[in-house]
């Protein structure tokens, strides 16, 4: 059984070697799986996402996010997209809030903010790990796709940025990564273009095309793998278009990407 955040509620034994976790195991991961079967003093939840059309689940290892990856959004955030190289940040796996297809899930308004923003994003799920991945092979590492929201405490992000401090507190908190189930790339193909939009209470806020990304999904995989070895279970939030904006309690957020079922949450 899983709750809305994707946690397995029963024993973790075998998690690392069953179902979708068997996507691509390295020797190091196999060793880790052996260790995982040993007795521990307490249980640590494993975040998983359902796989559409399957009884498998996708185990989430790391949540990577790219910043300012659409030119118009970079400009509205005060950056010059023609000069700046890509940069990435991470959210904790327990930031994930699973949103089933066809449901409007309650999304809690977080503490410590008075300026809570939506960001609609295509999410790539990694099934084959690697280091220093080449561009021509990058998409071979993608196992599936879904859509997700990078919810942001914008006032805290801005405050920390002005102080030249890391703005993790504005991005990495409970429920800050609503996300749909994983769709296998064998069923969807790769998403290089297509409409991406977000509505709040039925009115369009964000509206763009995936082909307007500054750095494509393949290029993001290349850049990420130069800094960190990627592993099965990593997911990549690939950036948001312009017109991010605030939401308040009672607002309903609906997100769309061509070729994927819509995602909807209600801020409570």
Language-model segments: residues:
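N-terminal secretory signal peptides and thylakoid transit peptides that target proteins
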Residues: 1-18
């Amino acid at each position: 059984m899983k709750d809305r955040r994707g946690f397995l509620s029963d024993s973790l034994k075998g998690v690392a070697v069953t179902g979708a976790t068997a996507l691509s195991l390295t020797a190091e991961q196999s060793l880790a799986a052996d260790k995982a079967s040993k007795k521990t003093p307490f249980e640590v939840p494993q975040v998983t996402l359902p796989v559409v059309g399957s009884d498998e689940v996708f185990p989430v290892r790391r949540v990577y996010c790219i910043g300012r990856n659409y030119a118009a959004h970079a400009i509205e955030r005060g950056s010059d997209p023609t000069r700046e190289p890509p940069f990435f940040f991470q959210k904790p796996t327990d930031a994930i809030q699973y949103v089933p297809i066809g449901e409007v899930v309650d999304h809690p308004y977080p503490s410590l903010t008075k300026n809570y923003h939506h960001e609609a994003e295509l999410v790539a799920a990694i099934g084959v790990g690697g280091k220093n991945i080449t561009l021509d092979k990058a998409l071979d590492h993608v196992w599936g796709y879904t859509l997700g929201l990078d919810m942001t405490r914008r006032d805290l992000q801005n405050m920390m940025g002005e102080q030249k401090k890391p703005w993790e507190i504005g991005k990495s908190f409970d429920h800050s990564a609503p996300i749909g189930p994983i769709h296998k790339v064998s069923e969807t193909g790769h998403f290089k273009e297509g409409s991406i939009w977000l509505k709040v209470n039925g009115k369009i806020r964000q509206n763009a095309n995936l082909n307007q990304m500054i750095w494509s999904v393949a290029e993001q995989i290349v850049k990420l793998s130069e800094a960190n070895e990627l592993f099965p279970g990593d997911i990549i939030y690939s950036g948001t278009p312009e017109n991010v904006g605030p939401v308040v309690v009672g607002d309903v957020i609906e997100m769309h990407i061509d070729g994927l079922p819509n995602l909807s949450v209600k801020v409570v």
